[in-house]
Amino acid sequence: MMTMQNFRVRSIKEDDINEWFRLRKLLWDESSDAEHKAEMLDIYEHTDSQLVLFAETEDGKLVGFLEASIRPFVEDCHSDHVGYLEGWFVEPDYRQYGIGRKLVRSAEIWARNKGCEEMASDSEIGNDLSFKAHLNLGYEETSRLVHLRKDLV
């Protein structure tokens, strides 16, 4: 049986790229491979304002990840330097062991060390699992937003 002690949270290493790609595709399956690779390159080149963390089991398997950033503006926040949870994911077989919580707490410490006084995130309307996970970690709903578009051609 897995326990909270059977994994560790660590920063990205160069040889994590393939596993990072695999985990990203599980979280954001609507993005193309090219979009993932472009975003990953951008994140990897801006480690001053971007963070990637992994949850690694004792046997070296990456079972979760988190991406965070520092944003100059976030809706409904009071400061202009905000830590932002871009996304986090834990493989289904490894959920309910505190892995997501530890990933998020590690990102919050990183943001605090970067001078942030607030941490923010988002969750798509209808993604109840994500919304409840945020609430369980102490985040509060500030607003709901639906994006709209129209072709002008």
PLM regions with names:
Residues 21-35:
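Helix-loop element at the rim of GNAT/NAT acetyltransferase active sites that forms part
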Residues 31-54:
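Active-site rim helix/loop that mediates acceptor-substrate recognition in acyltransferases
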Residues 72-85, 95, 142-143:
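A conserved beta-turn-beta hairpin within the catalytic core of GNAT-like acetyltransferases
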Residues 90, 96-109, 136:
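Conserved acetyl-CoA-binding loop-helix of GNAT-fold acetyltransferases
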Residues 104, 111-123:
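Conserved GNAT acetyl-CoA-binding A-motif
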